[in-house]
Amino acid sequence: MAPAIDSTVNDLQPNTPNPEKALSSQAQAFVRAYSEDGDSGGQSVLGAEDPLSPLNPRGERFNARAWAKNLAAVTRERGEGFRQVGISFQNVNVFGYGTPTDFQKNVGNVWLALPAMIRQLFAPKGGQTRIDILNHFNGLVRPGEMCVVLGPPGSGCSTFLKTISGHTSGLHVNPDAHFNYQGLSAKEMITAHRGDCIYTAEVDVHFPMLTVGETLTFAARARSQQHLPEGISRNNYCDQLRDVIMAMYGIRHTIHTKVGDDFVRGVSGGERKRVSVAEATLANAPFQCWDNSTRGLDSANAIEFCRTLRLQSEIFGQTCVVSMYQAPQTAYDLFDKVLLIYEGRQIYFGSTSKAKDYFVNLGFECPARQTTPDFLTSITFPAERIPRPDCQPPRTPDEFSQVWKNSLECKALQDEINEYNMEHPINGPDADTFRQLKQASQAQGQKVTSPFTLTYSQQVKLCMWRGWARFKADPWPAVWVMVGNTIMALIMSSLFYNMGQDTNSFYGRSVVLFMAILFNAFSSILEVMTLYAQRPIVEKQSRYAFYHPSAEAYASVLVDMPMKITSTISFNLVFYFMTNLNRAPGNFFFYLLVVFLIVLAMSGVFRFIGSLSRTEQQAMVPASVLMLALLIFTGFVVPVDYMLPWCRWINYVNPVAYGYEALMVNEFHGREFTCSTYIPEYANATSGTGACSVVGATPGNLFWRNVGIIIAMVIFNYLMYFIASEYVTAKKSRGEILVFRRGHTPSIPAKGSGDLEKLESGHATTVLERSDPSMVHKGEGFQGSVSVFHWNNVCYDLEIKGKPRRILDNVDGWIKPGTLTALMGVSGAGKTTLLDCLANRRVGVGIVTGEMLVDGKVCDQSFQRKTGYAQQQDLHLETSTVREALTFSAFLRQPHSIPKADKLTYVEEVIKLLAMQDYADAVVGVIGEGLNVEQRKRLTLGVELVAKPPLLLFVDEPTSGLDSQTSWAVLDLLEKLSKAGQSILCTIHQPSAMLFQRFDRLLFLAEGGKPVYFGEIGNDSSTLIDYFERNGAKPCLPGSNPAEWMLEAVGAAPSISSEGDWPEIWRSSPEYQSVHHELARLKAVDIDQLSADKPDPTSYNEFAAPLWQQLVVVTQRAFLQSWRSPSYIYSKITLCIATSLFIGLVFFNAPLSIQGLQNQMFAIFEVMSIVGQLVDQQMPNFLTQRSLYEVRERPAKTYSWMVFMLSQIVTELPWSTLASVFMWALFYYPIGFHKNAQAAGQGTERGALMWLLFWQFLVWVSTFTHMCISFVDSADDGGNIANFLFVLAFFFCGVLASPSQMPRFWIFLYRASPLSYWVSAVLSTGFANVQVTCTDKEYTAFDPPKGSTCGEYMAEYISRAGGYVKDPQATESCGYCTIKDTNVFLAAVSSDYDTRWRNFGILWVYIGFNIAAALALYWIARMPKGKKRL
């Protein structure tokens, strides 16, 4: 709220509405009493701790107006004031470049968009149409005034708000447009004073794990002024501001409740919306733009929101511009001015009290009971406006615009604007005053040209406070990381437990150090993903000028530091000492320092990648290739001397390589080891005639040089991360355009005007009259209800934090065929919960009691598929078209006995009924690139209608987010359906009087789910009004909205208290007795009819379609979904190609030497490292379809859970097959495996088997992913499980440690690891039965005894140990190679060529296990097991 005394400004200006007139006498008395009693100004601001004080926001008698007036008085007493910003704008034209439609990209046609993308690089506007959005706008909003912006979606409301608030990314404003922000230019306002001119979008993004109190405390501390009265600490003052705002918006009770989101349980949707509003209010901007911020609020809370803005404007002189799609009359009357937009044209700007008369004088009629805002927006709908017969009013947007420009009102507005501009010239005295007052409110040392209140260091401290709060709210991930690290350290170190002090441990020690550096380096890779979740929040708060994005980045690094230290210690302390590395204290702490620096260096790298890329898909491939490069060029997999020249530079820039080198020196420098194996191992061998079988090394001491280099890399990486986080923003939407399947794009002319973000809304807002009304009334093809659904004493109990809580309390009612029943209630009354319980969607969650009967019968297992439930969230598969979504529902939900042709015909009838012909082949898409809000609502209804629900239709919030005319159209549809015999129960938030009148009956709930009324509404709501007035409600005045009046009567708004116990009044009323008599009659009549019923046995089946048909239809849709997700498919294929190609080139043409064989083995080892990335790519796609299935399709009994799981698994097979071809070709041939096969005379068989193994590997990864994600909620949890299991399989596959080297205890893990069999099969297929030729460095050199040749001297040893001598006839400098053929090498890693096909078969068993486990785990963890219904 503006109290945010971040502003210290001049007194209210003469043109500001006088707050004295607005204050009630009671509030003035409060102010005088408590201002005089306060010891100081500061204490009077805080209002003491008296619970009865109207200035105490924690008290029951808190009065917001008194508090605000008191604050204003205290501020003036100190010689200060409040910053104020008005705005005048002249000749504003806004346009953009885009396309009204686009074709849907899929795997096959995505390349067709490449020329356009190239053209865009060189000519950004090429191939795009100029779209005029706003045309010639002029207006003036003075400080302390409120302006409401009205217009249908797509008219330009959002663009107007963004333009005047300076958020014009993707938009173009004409150069000669003039803006005057009370003496400040637009450029200065947008750059230097961004936080004083904010735009609040309608989306709610918050950190879900923070409480409401913490979220709002952060906002208050980020923007509150720095200079306060003596005796008040800044934190106490910010807490006071927070409490005041929470009390104003009625969310004081949620202070300790998590905000939550779609995955984290928290406050309700309406409360979350109020948290967003409260946060923006605490931003304390003197100029505020609110874009449809009342969406999701009931009318009482929407009015309360506007009253709060009115209070800010009156007391503190703040300027508010608000767009509202459904504005209650009471809210409209709180505004000073109104702007009406018609397809991008300004057709009125002026006083709210004169707007109605302006259009009436033009020749339009305002129907009785229609509110002024509804009348004004109806002017923009030809089908809704009512011209008088004796007039010729304007018809087109251009005509309306021209009439406005020629009007006396427009001329008066221009004169007022010119006068304002003369009073407040750009860079005049007002601008200087504003800058001085802003400087006074900023922290010491902050520049006035900075939009931020706090200094950079203060921003970092505040973000650290929030980061620590986030950690405390959810510490378990960090705890599990430490536990997991300790477990992994125990397992991995036990592989090399207590290594000896001899040369046999050399390889083991190098592997141990490699594993340590690898584990620590990549422990931060998940930080790439966490950045995307918080990016929308950081960008929003940066727009509010809370902090620099880089300050949040810096703070997150510091907050994560303790966790990084503890996780590093938890792993390395166990790992270091169990493996018996150098136990000298200095060496241990040096090791700990190096691995910690590597953790920081790689954290900076991954964070930089995440900040640099706009989407997760963009980050995945480069992160994977980077991981691969760092891993290969560490110096272990490929020794430095064996690195190819073209890629040697990677080793120089690799921090992991410097760390590994430092650890190797730290481990071996200055130590002596006993030689374990001499060559030849003869009893009479001397030092001259034998040698130790270990490769030598070059002495050196690179301890601190490498540490210095790593520290420099840490600093550089984090610096790049901070820069990227500051300047790289998330991917922006292209604007709301329709996307069609290629070949189905209709010829839609460009509008030439409209809102770029909502470009196609105008096309979609087709009135329902376009469909043939006779189709519904005649009942042609449409099936209505024939049964009565009734319920009695329904209760719903839930356990929250260990305490029982009743959500619904003895609710009664019925729905009869042909009736439209409204379900209303105060915010949080349990409206959606009641729908869920009645629709049997709360199975397994809480306890439902009471009777729910259909024609006197208890609901059977077919009840859910016989009812339609149009949910508030418009959940649809993004890649499906409208027609496909409807066809899918018809095929699986209509009875199997109905012919396919009849189902398709009915789909077309529903498309006509819902007037969706223009976009029937449009893709659902996402908001911004696909259907708009209204089109999604219609599709949601359509999906339920094509199912032909024989019982009833539940509709949850069908008008949420829609403008009044579109809401009318939706209610028109529901009314037509009810007249055709359909039974409908519909929840609704903000009905106008005319909208409310269209319902037949009302079920009204109070807080706690207690019924307040159930019965007829009556003509002009007479029955309802009579009931409430008869029981003590104040009279409903003529012309007022009965729905709003009813909500106020029961105390729905935070500032309104109910004078009576309405639930108790209802239970004592004769109407309540009549309801129970009718319920008893319905039950008795239905029981009498039971014997006459002869239902079809198939009607009791759980699903309408047989299992085989479900599998075919669902699999087909799942495949289409993947086919139409080219970003996923090409990311998967690109990852496989890039990985194989990179490995193939790094190990290009590997020789058949000892090191060459090791390189080939490690090439196979590196290929397996992409499992984590493939898992991360696949999981989000699965979760998208699972969310749709579990939220909408499973409760509707559309198809079986087993069909869902199997369809997801089958769909991945074609793409795994395709990727395996590229992966095999780019791996098998560059490395040279084909040469090995040809040398062994088995080229065809080995090549084919190698491809089968690669294909099998990708299939295994796919099924492994499904197993890990099937039963958990999020991709993070599934990824952690998959990562843990994969690491075990990865390290125990026999590459890093052969089975003979493993402790006996861990042999079972080697045998249990599926990768053991895959690696064995690939190794043996890759280079079995081939001769080995050692390089010069690989020969062990020694001299034979005098008189002997090398061959003679080594004959006995070779017969026992194998190998060969380089030159058997030599008499000196014998060169001995320990391996003669590749089979010896394979035997050392327990790989046998004869078991290749056996291993191939065993891996299929693992794949089968993955599938079975995925099905079992899904059923156990996610399928409701029973009905908690009594």
From Swiss-Prot:
Pfam family membership, one: ABC2_membrane_7
Function according to Swiss-Prot or TrEMBL: ABC transporter; part of the gene cluster that mediates the biosynthesis of eupenifeldin, a bistropolone meroterpenoid that acts as an antitumor agent.
Keywords noted in UniProt: ATP-binding, Cell membrane, Glycoprotein, Membrane, Nucleotide-binding, Repeat, Transmembrane, Transmembrane helix, Transport
Predominant cellular place of this UniProt entry's protein: membrane
GO terms of molecular function: ABC-type transporter activity; ATP binding; ATP hydrolysis activity
Name of protein: ABC transporter eupT
SUPFAM superfamilies: P-loop containing nucleoside triphosphate hydrolases
UniProt record similarity statement: Belongs to the ABC transporter superfamily. ABCG family. PDR (TC 3.A.1.205) subfamily.
List of residues binding ATP: 825-832
TM annotation in the entry: 476-496, 511-531, 557-577, 586-606, 620-640, 707-727, 1133-1153, 1213-1233, 1249-1269, 1278-1298, 1305-1325, 1400-1420
CDD domains with a match to the protein in the record: ABCG_PDR_domain1, ABCG_PDR_domain2
Biotechnology usage: Eupenifeldin is a bistropolone-humulene meroterpenoid first discovered as an antitumor and anti-leukemia agent. This metabolite also shows anthelmintic activity against the parasitic worm Hemonchus contortus, anti-malarial activity as well as antifungal activity.
Designated gene of the protein: eupT
Highest taxon above the source species: Eukaryota
Glycosylation positions in this chain: 292, 684, 1019
One GO CC annotation: plasma membrane
Membrane topology value: Multi-pass membrane protein
Disruption phenotype: Abolishes the production of eupenifeldin.
Domain ABC transporter stretches: 112-368, 789-1032
Localization per record: Cell membrane
Disordered: annotated span: 1-26
Keyword Chloroplast: no
